[in-house]
Amino acid sequence: MAGIYIAMGAMVYLSISDKLAASLFFATGILLVLNLHNRLFTRVCPLFAYNGSYRPGDLFIAWIGNGIGTALVAILIHFTRFEAGILGRIEEIVIPKLADSPVSLTILGLFCALFVAFAVFVGGIRQKQGTFAQIFYVWLFITAFV
């Protein structure tokens, strides 16, 4: 389900032209993952390293499951009118990345993963679920990387 929640957040992100507003709404996918205890890969990794609450096999399950959930949403969107509205925004995001170097993409990907890990750790572990503090920290870190 985590891949589905993140893909839904991405759908909203892609449909809003204002980047700040879009970033704020993208975080709803992360909040769903945290509050519904789903296995988002970028949640499982830091918790595996931090407190061992996940096993190595959980990393694989989360990775495959996230990919399946995301692919399912992408396939379903393909059959809706929503697809036409977000294709231009997808191109704006993807084209610069295709022109970037592998080293740059790796470094930026690591920073992205760190921001998600911070959101999970500070917002999802250190704060009570559904509190203003949890929502604030998740939105802060996710908005920063998006």
Which residues are covered by each model-predicted region?
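Alpha-helical transmembrane segments and their helix-helix packing motifs
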Residues: M1-V146
